């Protein structure tokens, strides 16, 4: 029976066999539901979840089962230590784009960058 953080994480992970990182996704989704960091979540494995917390968390797991990106479930994606709002209408910033920015910032100045609005706008904002 799912009653505390640890049992919910175990259940959630078992529900996500077709995602790349079921444990990570489970932790991120539950931490978000409880308004905790992942570190805080791990320190509270014995915390009993309320019925409303379980209901919201299970709904988020169902969304992830349907292959909805974690960032869209959360409503944001962290990029260069900044949270950017995302939804189904925005391309989620990818980690590979951070490498692109690091490479560009190491280029000799001056240089020009053109961002044609093909995503979330993180390139224009960060650069």
Model-derived features: where do they sit?
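Conserved SAM/SAH cofactor-binding pocket of Class I
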Residues: 95-127
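Generic signature of intrinsically disordered, low-complexity segments enriched in small/polar residues
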Residues: 11, 48, 82, 125-127
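Conserved AdoMet
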Residues: 31-103, 107
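Non-catalytic accessory regions of SAM-dependent methyltransferases
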Residues: 1-36, 40-42, 46-49, 59
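Compositionally biased, low-structure terminal segments
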Residues: 9, 80, 110-112
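A general structural signal for well-ordered alpha-helical segments in protein cores
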Residues: 9, 26-27, 57, 67-70, ...
